[in-house]
């Protein structure tokens, strides 16, 4: 029998089982025989959370006592996925949790699979933020993540008749046992109104008189570092109305007006990325961004002012604020507003503090993806901030003129205000000017930022631009997602790799050991069987595990070139139909696609439809369907990725060179032993450097070659110059894949022909097809060599840990140090309660 007072923090299987049973009984009035699956999941989640809470509190107290500088990571997205397995692995209690549940007649897997994904992100941006939070806690670096607690995350994707259908992702419908509501941390956020001017005490004073208020309430989620010592906080803001429900209006019969303010306020945290094709959607997105920035900065300032005798000049020594893309860049004028209007600092002092505090991460090389807001909208919603932006811009441009005398075009380019109709506010320019650091996320990306996108800013601020190549957390993407491979690695080199990923380089020593290389292949086979089981349950796909598994999973976008992959499959299909010898020698292959298209992105949604149509034709063609399979996996999310990535043989990373900032999916596949077929784009360049060109299938035109090609590019010449490409295009034109929907794929054909193929698919397709043939032949004819290359990819992925990335941010940008937190061995709940009174 466990000691009664150890039930909430003891880590034996008995103590966990008792806590689980007590959660059922006292929180749900249930027992182990009469409860639902959801109730059991909630009970075990609360039991695990109990083992986090004390260390979470101790982490905060230790960081406060040590006066540790903290990093505040502001991101509109946090694609966390499921929390339970990650938490028990990082706490080191996986075995006792499973034993506890087994002793009561339940399986851990059943309850694990009940947890919904926390889909508070759209793709790489949000998943990067999640990996960074894991690394920050594991490295014992004091940190808060700040974002929005969306009631509905990224939509749930269904495929109906080949089309993407968006369904609401009501991930909070059963509550979230990992979070704690913090009503004591509620902040007012204001919009609209006017600004009044006053001259007093020999200084200009501005007062914002807003006409709208919402409140932001904090919800905290613990982020457990590996080893369970440091527990940092992800703080998400939920919007509500300060006015609530109006009984007066309700009783007078105006039922709609009685709840209007409440509904309008709560809209701010309802949906991730509302459709902004309409004015109302744009306004809502702008309000969302300011809402989370305002709440976060009020919270940061509150924490800073808690110290006695605080001095604002020390603020950058206490706080580093990192802007994950431009979505939080309103933090620049908001901090200025707080310092100048609320705290009474002079402009120069406030600006010095702001720039020293802020860092900005750029995530795009697409000029049209750089965020801009209509100036009239900004003036209407945030009138005081617009005044501050004007003043920032005026001072900056007056100093920049000396760099570009008589060059009005360059001055116009670096201005925060774009002189269009209507005028626009350029958020990337604001972030660069207002931050002491601007970083790219891969070596090529950072090079192109300073050479192509922002050369003028680099001339003015040469010390501000730097590179921080992205990374992934090996704890989720290898230890958690691929336990068989993790065990094999630990068996070979020990377990230090879990927190020091450089250790996996030691695996290179096993590349000439045939028995170990064979084990790598066996692990991949087991992962395929697991993936097949998952896909059958998740979406009904029957995966042939004896085939080469070729996977492209990522956001659907024309620059990521899912269409290139699909066109290559059409070429392979035609060749199989026309050439018996080719068909008989073909390596059986399954092509898996997954990813979501933005609801308003017509061509991306058509690409999904085309892949689905391709799948329907090929999978039902008896001449080829025992050799060639094509599937679109619906509702791509973290959990699906965790099951598919370990099973992949060939990873598709095929964006047009010079368009992908970095990518992190490429790193996840590499660490799990997939070979990559890819262009020299984003982090693929650094992957190729580390693994060697013999162990990666690089193809296509380089970024420089694309730039030269674009000067007189003609896609139709490339089509007509290759009979197989022309045959594939003609087959699509003929309506062969249309399924009685006449002209359905004309917009895609138009993008390739009439619109001259912006992303150079036709220029790269033959090269891509050739490399595919080489990969297929190697897999078929020399599996041992393939497995050796797989091992070398795992060993060469050492550089791509988010631990390495975060250490670079901490040393070069944030200047923060680890704060070591002792592991609590005893329950001090009563002592803590007495001290608090």
State where each predicted segment sits.
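A conserved ligand/cofactor-binding region detector
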Residues: 1-837
């Amino acid at each position: 029998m466990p000691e009664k007072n150890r039930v909430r923090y003891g880590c034996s299987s008995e103590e966990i089982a008792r806590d689980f049973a007590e959660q059922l009984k006292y929180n749900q009035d249930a027992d182990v025989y009469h409860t639902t699956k959801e109730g059991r999941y909630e009970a075990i989640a609360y039991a695990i959370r109990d083992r986090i809470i004390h260390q979470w509190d101790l982490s905060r107290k230790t960081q406060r006592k040590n006066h540790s500088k903290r990093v505040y990571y502001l991101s509109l997205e946090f694609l966390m996925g499921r929390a339970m397995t990650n938490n028990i692995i990082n706490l080191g209690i996986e075995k006792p949790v499973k034993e506890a549940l087994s002793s009561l007649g339940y399986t851990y897997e059943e309850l694990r699979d009940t947890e919904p994904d926390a889909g508070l992100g759209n793709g790489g941006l949000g998943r990067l933020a999640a990996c960074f939070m894991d690394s920050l806690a594991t490295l014992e670096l004091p940190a808060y993540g700040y974002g929005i607690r969306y009631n509905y995350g990224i939509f749930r994707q269904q495929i109906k008749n080949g089309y993407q259908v968006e369904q609401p992702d009501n991930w909070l419908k059963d509550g979230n046992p990992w979070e704690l509501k913090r009503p004591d941390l509620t902040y007012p956020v204001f919009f609209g109104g006017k600004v009044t001017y006053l001259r007093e005490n020999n200084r200009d004073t501005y007062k914002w008189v807003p006409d709208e208020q919402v409140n932001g309430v904090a919800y905290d989620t613990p982020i457990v570092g590996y080893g369970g010592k440091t527990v940092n906080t992800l703080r998400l803001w939920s919007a509500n109305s300060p006015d609530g429900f109006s009984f007066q209006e309700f009783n007078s019969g105006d039922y709609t007006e009685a709840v209007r303010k409440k509904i309008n306020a709560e809209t701010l945290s309802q949906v991730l990325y509302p459709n902004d094709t309409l004015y109302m959607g744009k306004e809502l997105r702008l309000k969302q961004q300011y809402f989370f920035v305002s709440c976060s900065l009020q919270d940061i300032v509150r924490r800073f002012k808690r110290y006695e005798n605080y001095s604002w000049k020390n603020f950058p020594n206490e706080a580093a604020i990192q802007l994950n893309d431009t979505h939080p860049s309103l933090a620049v004028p908001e901090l200025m507003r707080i310092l100048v209007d609320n705290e009474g600092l002079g402009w120069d002092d406030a600006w010095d503090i702001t720039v020293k505090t802020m860092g900005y991460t750029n995530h795009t090389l697409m000029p049209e993806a750089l965020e801009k807001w209509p100036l009239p909208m900004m003036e209407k919603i945030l009138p005081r901030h617009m005044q501050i932006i004007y003043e920032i811009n005026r001072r900056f441009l007056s100093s920049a003129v000396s760099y570009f005398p008589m060059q009005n075009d360059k001055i116009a380019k670096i201005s925060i205000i774009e002189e269009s109709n209507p005028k626009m506010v350029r958020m990337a320019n604001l972030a660069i000017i207002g931050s002491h650091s601007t970083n790219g996320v891969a070596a090529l990306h950072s090079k192109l930022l300073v050479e192509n996108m922002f050369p003028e800013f680099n001339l003015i601020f040469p010390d501000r631009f730097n590179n921080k190549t992205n990374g992934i957390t090996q704890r989720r993407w290898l230890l958690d997602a691929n336990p068989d491979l993790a065990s094999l690695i630990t068996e070979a080199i020990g377990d230090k790799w879990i927190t020091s990923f450089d250790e996996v380089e030691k695996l290179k020593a096993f590349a000439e050991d045939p028995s170990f290389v064979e084990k790598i292949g066996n692990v991949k086979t087991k992962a395929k069987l697991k993936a097949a089981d998952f896909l059958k349950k998740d979406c009904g796909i029957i995966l042939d595990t004896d085939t080469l598994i070729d996977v492209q999973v990522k956001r659907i976008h024309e620059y990521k070139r899912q269409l290139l992959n699909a066109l290559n499959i059409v070429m392979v299909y035609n060749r199989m139909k026309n050439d018996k010898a080719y068909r008989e020698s073909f390596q059986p292959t399954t092509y898996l696609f997954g990813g979501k298209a933005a609801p308003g992105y017509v061509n991306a949604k058509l690409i999904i439809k085309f892949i689905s149509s391709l799948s329907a034709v090929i999978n039902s063609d008896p001449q080829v369907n025992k050799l060639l399979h094509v599937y679109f996996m619906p509702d791509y999310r973290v959990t699906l990725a965790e099951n598919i990535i370990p099973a992949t043989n060939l990873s598709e990373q095929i964006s047009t060179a010079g368009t992908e900032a970095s990518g992190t999916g490429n790193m996840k596949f590499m660490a799990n032993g997939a070979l990559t077929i890819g262009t020299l784009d984003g982090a693929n360049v650094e992957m190729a450097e580390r693994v060697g060109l013999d162990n990666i299938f690089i193809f296509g035109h380089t970024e420089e070659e694309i730039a030269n090609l674009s000067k007189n590019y003609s896609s139709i010449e490339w089509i007509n110059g290759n009979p197989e490409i022309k045959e594939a295009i003609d087959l699509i034109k003929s309506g062969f894949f249309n399924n009685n929907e006449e002209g359905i794929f004309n917009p895609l054909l138009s993008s390739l022909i009439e619109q001259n193929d912006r992303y150079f698919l036709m220029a790269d397709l033959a090269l891509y097809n050739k490399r595919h043939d080489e990969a297929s032949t190697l897999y078929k004819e020399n599996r041992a060599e393939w497995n050796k290359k797989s091992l070398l990819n795992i060993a060469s992925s050492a550089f791509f840990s988010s631990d390495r990335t975060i250490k670079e941010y901490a040393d070069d940008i944030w200047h923060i140090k680890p704060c070591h937190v002792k592991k609590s061995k005893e329950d001090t709940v009563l002592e803590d309660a007495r001290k608090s009174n």
